């Protein structure tokens, strides 16, 4: 993933040459140094945690202390002496939005970016497609079998079974999967433009309606999700993808399980909506509802 950022910066040096840059959540300062190497005049590297001290050491060791200014503090609290030409960050979490760093990225834009300035990355796209995987479904189901016992040292546990089942199926499955599990060659996308999206209207609640025609007769066990981000530079467009069709990344992919699988025949259609609602745990609640068109069959 780091290499993709380096490529995006180096292939768009015109966007960095003699420009003022903000790095949101700089961490150890790698992206700030990439911006300096691409010719930036000044880079404000902002980091809320104590790792900012490591970033300062790294910047000095690489001879860029005159260019890269490491500032420890939250974006909300930091004041800069000038507006900036480009904002860089690695704000993506699982399913793009987990950790809620996108809101900080967008807040920095509202606070410091010049009207004609750029966001790197520029857009993020969530992809969804129904999948079939009986093995993972059985695995989750079996994880609650402990609560099937009617005589656990004289105690009947079955009353707690449904709650345990609900909790097991409420957890997203984070990991890699084969694209052969997808039941459609098409996917539904939701694009977030970091240059225009607002913290409140665009990121607090994300609604993704969908409709899919099955390419094969199958059992739908849930919804598979992944994302990409694109860097729309003046000289080149660079994409970082977490797709199951692309090389693995540390963001993996996500799968959301239905409690009741849906049997579907080739050419039948399922439709519904996936809703992501921001919560106080720096993440999102995800609600998924799916219906087999032309029937009363539905699941969530």
Locate each region found by the language model.
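Class I SAM-binding transferase module
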Residues: 1-24, 28-300
């Amino acid at each position: 993933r780091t290499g993709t950022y380096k490529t995006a910066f180096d292939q768009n040096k015109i966007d960095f040459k003699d420009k003022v840059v903000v790095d949101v959540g700089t961490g150890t300062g790698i992206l700030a140094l990439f911006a300096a190497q691409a010719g930036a005049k000044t880079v404000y590297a902002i980091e809320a945690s104590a790792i900012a001290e490591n970033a300062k050491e790294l910047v000095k060791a690489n001879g860029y202390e005159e260019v890269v200014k490491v500032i420890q503090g939250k974006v909300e609290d930091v004041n800069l002496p000038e507006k900036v030409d480009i904002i860089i960050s690695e704000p993506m979490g699982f399913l793009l939005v987990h950790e809620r760093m996108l809101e900080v990225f967008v807040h920095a834009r509202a606070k410091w970016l010049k009207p004609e300035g750029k966001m790197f990355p520029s857009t993020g796209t969530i992809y969804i497609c129904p999948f079939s995987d009986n093995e993972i479904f059985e695995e989750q189901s079996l994880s609650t079998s402990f609560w099937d016992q009617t005589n656990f040292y004289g105690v009947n546990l079955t009353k707690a079974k449904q709650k345990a089942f609900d909790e097991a199926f409420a957890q997203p499955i984070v990991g890699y999967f084969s694209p052969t599990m997808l039941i459609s060659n098409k996917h539904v996308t939701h694009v977030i433009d970091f240059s225009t999206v607002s913290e409140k209207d665009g990121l607090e609640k994300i609604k993704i309606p969908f409709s899919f025609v099955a390419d094969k007769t199958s059992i739908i066990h849930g919804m598979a999700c992944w994302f990409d981000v694109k860097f729309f530079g003046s000289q080149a467009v660079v994409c970082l993808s977490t797709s199951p069709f692309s090389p693995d990344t540390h963001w993996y992919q996500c799968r959301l399980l239905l409690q009741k699988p849906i049997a579907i025949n080739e050419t039948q259609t399922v439709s519904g909506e996936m809703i992501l609602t921001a919560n106080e745990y720096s993440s999102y609640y995800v609600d998924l509802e799916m219906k087999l068109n032309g029937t009363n069959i539905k699941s969530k």
